[in-house]
Amino acid sequence: MSLLKERKPKKPHYIPRPPGKPFKYKCFQCPFTCNEKSHLFNHMKYGLCKNSITLVSEQDRIPKCPKSSSLDPKQTHQPEPTSKPATSKSLLNGLSSFDPKSQQGSAKEDAKENLEMQARGAHKGPQKPALQKEMAPEAILSTQPCLDSGVRHSAFVPVGEHRLRGPEDTEATEVLANSTTKASSFHAKSAFHTPGYPWKAGSPFLPPDFPHKISSTKGFGAISPYMHPAIPEYPHPFYAEHGLAAIYSPYLLTGNTPECETTLLSVYGTQDQRHFLSPAGPIPKHLNTSPSTYDHYRFFQQYHSNLPIPYGFYRPESAFPSYSLRLPSVTGITRDQSSRLLEDATLAYPASSPSELNLSSSHRKHTECEKGSPVPEAKDPSKDGQRDAEEAKMSPRAGSAATGSPGRPSPTNFTQTSQTFEGLCDLSNKAASSGTLERLQQAEQSPTAFKPVQRGSESPHSQPPANRTESPKSLQAMNGDPPAQTGSSNSFITEAPPSSPEDHSRIGPLNLSKKLETNPAATYGPMYASNAQADTLQDLPLNLSVKDLCNAWAPRPALPGPPQGAEPAATPKTETKGSEDRTSRVETPQDKAHSRTTPDVHTEDSSDEQKQTAAVALCQLAAYSPGNVRVADEEGTVQEPTRQDVPTLSATENLEAQCDLRPKGQKRTSQRDTGKSQQGTKKPKLNDPVPRVLTLRRRTRVS
């Protein structure tokens, strides 16, 4: 075995299987076949595809005839079940002048030869001379005078011909030698093609066909006859494999066959997917020509899932443009046919146009989802609008557990919350009357992040629908007069869980632990809810997004006095809770929420500061590092030197609140954190004038 020098595997790995038996394993990029995985493994390991390809391609033409003739007597009678159909079909085209006997024999032999050449591609080189010597006698054995293919230069003649033409045997070898030189020049290319071919389809018998087609060069001696059969023959498997026939062939084949042929060859040679798009050139013209092609594409949408790669590749370039063109014009049809596409697309699209697409499709989703709930939806148009807003807000939550990603936190919810705070207020108003239900929800909150929302929307069951109609009024009242504000703020406190899922979605990307889901969102939920009214007016929920940390931190110095005064009231509670943090998690949100009740009362006076406190609360969650929080707190204290006692308390309170939250996110013991943060906050209170510098120093120390 001459090739043994190049590689280590033992000869048995490359002993061809007896040609009649089907092979279990086939190299996916060259004609090698075998029945043992280890053989194939070695073949791949030592990268012998090149060997087998070159051997099959170039040495195929020389030893192929002799080899088949050498093994002829034994092989001709072993049926080749697997590859015979393919080769015999192709041979029947070429061998139409053969008599049936010779057709069958040569087909079988060709198939066997191919398989053997594939399997034996590795050690065929040394056998060449011997096989050529054997060729004359055995070919004489199988002489069939009917095959004077001096007349016929079919693609398949040479294979059978040299085998079956005994007397002209010597001439056959000469022809083979000549054509081998010529064809090897071409076949360098085709050997290169051959790997690509199985690559594309993996159909094991295309390479076998291929050597026959090449062998046509043997008989004919010229390359052009080979090239011509190649183009009619390749396109069929090529198209059929890739499903291009369905899509491209009408255009390609109708338009310009010469160009089509050249592109086919190039595609075939390079096996580069980008070339698949080059044949697609005609299609864009078609698309532009007539509007009916939109119907054509609409027609294809149903199939595009099953269609093979080239259509998938092509679709982004033309079909999606057509999508965007059609979204306005043909919306009805698009929604009917590709509603699934659109609703899936809502995940991709919201970034670009969340308001449109999300609202449309997620409304659809949620209306379907919540139609089941017997809430009297049509009681009031404003109620309906709010309900829709709720649904729009919740739809991402219902659809996917965690909307958004750390890099880009759920644009869907940010845009929607600006439009759906009415929904929030509606929810909270309902919640005011059904507080017990909300307690239940708070208990349920940890296992089900989404249920509270549904519950919140169902709470009207326990409540006359009049309350729902109230909600717009109460919206104005919240913005207008403090008494209504206090009432609704209490409702917000109970309502923390229902509003919290939406807050989760804001905080979602940051707090990935379940524990955090219950507490922080419920903690800051009330603030959001209470600020919802002011936010609806100014669309500021967007500024609460994690992206806007800078904007949110900056306003912190303007912290209102009242909120800070109110927070110390809860300081003892939260401090005790700090230690029991993990046990009483549900209470903590409520206590903290109550601690913020007073800020809620002041919303209409200091709605801006309230917004900022909400923002700061969120940002404290977002930026876990205690240093950042302290920066904000100290800025606040600098700006309010008169209230130094209260700021100290409230800052420590804030930090403790955050330490209560942080341990859940960061698995630290709340005691230690609280101690650290208290140290951190109390120090700069002593040196008030230079809080910034100390903050920087302490930030490194604590974090």
From Swiss-Prot:
Keywords: Activator, Differentiation, Metal-binding, Nucleus, Transcription, Transcription regulation, Zinc, Zinc-finger. It is found in: Nucleus. One of its GO terms (biological process) is establishment of skin barrier. Its main location: nucleus. Residues 64-113, 350-527, 553-614, 630-703 are annotated as: Disordered. It comes from the Eukaryota. GO terms for molecular function: DNA-binding transcription activator activity, RNA polymerase II-specific; DNA-binding transcription repressor activity, RNA polymerase II-specific; promoter-specific chromatin binding; RNA polymerase II cis-regulatory region sequence-specific DNA binding; zinc ion binding. Zn(2+) binds at C27, C30, H43, C49. Transmembrane segments: none annotated. One of its GO terms (cellular component) is nucleus. Coiled coil: none annotated. Residues 352-361 have a biased composition (Low complexity). Pfam families: zf-C2H2_7 (PF15269). Residues 367-394, 574-611 have a biased composition (Basic and acidic residues). Residues 67-106, 410-421, 456-477, 639-655 have a biased composition (Polar residues). Transcription factor involved in epidermis differentiation. Required for terminal epidermal differentiation: acts downstream of p63/TP63 and activates expression of late epidermal differentiation genes. Specifically binds to the promoter of KLF4 and promotes its expression. This is Zinc finger protein 750. The lineage of its organism: Eukaryota, Metazoa, Chordata, Craniata, Vertebrata.
